[in-house]
Amino acid sequence: MAVFLKSTIFAPMKEFLQILRRFVPPYKKYLGLSILFNILSAILNIFSFAALIPILQILFKVDGGIRVNEYMHWNGDWGSIKEVATNNLYYYIQEFIVVHSASTALLVIGIFLAFMTFLKTGAYFLSSATIIPIRTGIVRDIRNQIYQKINSLSLGFFSEERKGDIIARMSGDVQEVENSIMSSLDMLFKNPILILFYFVTLICISWQLTLFTILFVPPFGWFMGVVGKKLKAHSIEAQALWSDTMSMVEETLGGLRIIKAFCAEEKMNKHFNQVNSSYRDNIMRVNIRQQMAHPMSEFLGTILIVVVLWFGGILVLDYGRIDGPTIIFYLVMLYSIINPLKEFSKASYNIPKGLASMERIDKILQAEVEIKDKENPEHISSFEHQIEFRHVSFAYTDRKSAELVYVLKDINLVIPKGKTVALVGQSGSGKSTMVDLIPRYYDVQEGEVLIDGINVKDLAVHDLRMLIGNVNQEAILFNASFKDNIRFGKTDATDEEIANAAKIANAYEFITKSEHGFDTNIGDRGGRLSGGQRQRVSIARAILKNPPILILDEATSALDTESERLVQDALEKLMKTRTTVAVAHRLSTVKHADEICVLHEGRIVERGTHEELIKKEGYYKKLHDMQQV
């Protein structure tokens, strides 16, 4: 049984305490106040219930209505302090009854009981109120840590994770941590204090009865552990199914156009219903098991009360070691200790669910940050000479075979300052991967990428990326105003600087014609704009940042002719005096590049100007002729 209890009760509790050690320290002040108020609440509760004994003795005329006692001096040799205190309390009550009558004494004791209860409930409220900042603060901190971790992880991490799964962890899993683990904070900080004080009180009343009661606690705990043993495993499965549900919603929102184009609504509805039903079936099993906590603890608590009442009755009726009012007080205190024990039983169900969610959250929080500054990195504030790829190879690990799949192989390229180099080739030839190595979105496995002769791995990541501006095929905009999107990389930009950037990017006219001008919200991912408008806002953002190095990743490939003309004009203005690396699908957009590099299967197979490559009649000429058809 000891091994079973260790695996079902103590192991989850150990994990729970480890989580609290990670997140509670900033809230020690609130924790201290909560413990203080819990101690006060427990003491006041004991005193309020202790008033029941004289009330019951007066009502049922035990020992003639109240014991007849002589006053004992506190420094006399009368026995224990408990015996002296009890005797003198009854003495004062006895004297009060003689002077004022039993009914008046009953009223005064009742008022004392009500007053102590008022103080107790006030302390109880304050103990719970001081837990709330801890609970809400920890949940906020977890969400902040997840978001900050997402921003710090390399792009490679997200190529292996579904966006919907990450969203599910930040929403559903964090919510489960709040509902399951944080709701158990009361259990940890309040109930042990109550149990300790009530247990000491029970021993003081009758150590024989208390010893008898203790014998029943381990089997009850074992029985509760049997039910909760598999809860964590079921909860992990449920949260994984919730991630599948969220991932499908995210994919549907991103692919609605295709779903409608292929009349696949019914197919997608059926698939979603299957995924959603699987989640419902699993979470139903988890909740049913969880809901067993209260009725089971209620039933076991009643059995304990009945057994104690039977044994206590023997002590009263057969041995006279305890009187009736005192046994009732004992039962009241025992019932008071059962409630905290019930909370422990509920926690034994709730905590495993939260631990399952925390385990999924930690897969993000504890993921290794691959792209980070080395110790004492070199700082750079300007670009002076050249970008160089020196024997660069890049590969990723195939998830099925666990083998390295090379995307780039032995790349050697020098891009002098102020020059424009274009990368062309078929899809999958490694063009986008190559430009992603310059701002160090990924690290190379072999070779070096150098800026002014310094390996990018040796540079501070922030300094490196501040030198680079990006304009991608899909303009990445945020659900904010034109102004906020354009000044995204330069928050201190003036309105005049923002307007000038928009003019250079050919975006000023349509921005000023919008409802609120530069303060107009552009919608989720710029959904209220056309493709060309989104791209020009993206170019304005790059212009405002004013970087010496510019990366264009197929910036005009998805645009119509008119939009392409406007965007191309804006790009030419942006490229002036800048070192530019352009990934191009349409060869017509890179005819004027200083050098064109042709990639095929991860290697540079040709290089030169447009005219030189056409004359070679090689792979570039083949691509050019295909686009002329």
Question: What does each model-found stretch correspond to?
Answer:
Residues 4-9, 374, 380-629:
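ABC-type nucleotide-binding domain
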Residues 10-21, 57, 64-93, 129-175, ...:
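Extended non-transmembrane interhelical loops and adjacent amphipathic helices
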Residues 25-29, 155-156, 172-181, 185, ...:
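An intracellular "coupling" helix at the cytosolic face of ABC transporter transmembrane type-1 domains
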